[in-house]
Amino acid sequence: MLDTEDRIRLSSLMLEDTLQILSVAPPLTQVIIVSADKRADEIATKHGAKFLPEEKESGVNSAVALADGYCIEKEAADATIVIPHDLPLLDSIVISKACELAEKESTCIVICPSVRYDGTNMLLRKPPSVIGTFYETDSYNMHVRTAIKLGIPVKPLLSKSLMYDIDTPEDALQLIKEENVAAKSLEFIKSKL
């Protein structure tokens, strides 16, 4: 569907879309991007986000661990939210809702699955080290089962703006049908069809 150059462009646009939303989400005090790709550094800087470089792409769990270390040691964060950059329907209202769900809890996770319930499209952890992350296979169920096993309150947040991601060409085809979405990434996909 997309050649390598188009995929790089789409990835950059998805990151731009995500950072534009997160930069206006009132409860967030810091947005952190972890990547080995220097283009991500430029985009993060443009949106006032902190960029943490990886020496090489080591997977999502490694990137989250790097960000967790920074958040705990440098920011003294009492909670973190992990959000992938492939959510073109993302809005700041749902981020506020996730924070509200955790606000009165001393320990919890707030979690939103992917539309297929096999991935985790948003994971708020309070405190950040309350559970590790399992962004490999069936991450949504792994996160929920781990939290339950440890006696940590699980607060599901089911939101269309979080559940729909772009993991497959079929996902992209479904998402371009959405109306009133200002995501540059979706406009780019539409232009390539």
Stretches found by the model and what they are:
Residues 1-31:
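N-terminal glycine-rich phosphate-binding loop and ensuing alpha1 helix
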Residues 26-50:
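Acidic donor-binding segment of Leloir-type glycosyltransferases
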Residues 29-31, 79, 153:
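Residues at the starts of beta-strands that form the adenosine-phosphate
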Residues 45-79, 140:
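Short phosphate-binding loop-to-helix
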Residues 84-88:
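The conserved acidic donor/metal-binding loop of glycosyltransferases
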Residues 90-116:
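Conserved donor-nucleotide/metal-binding helix-loop-beta segment in metal-dependent transferases, i.e.
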Residues 125-147:
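Short, glycine-/small-residue-rich phosphate/pyrophosphate-handling segment
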Residues 138, 144-193:
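Conserved alpha/beta core of the MobA/IspD/sugar-nucleotide pyrophosphorylase nucleotidyltransferase superfamily
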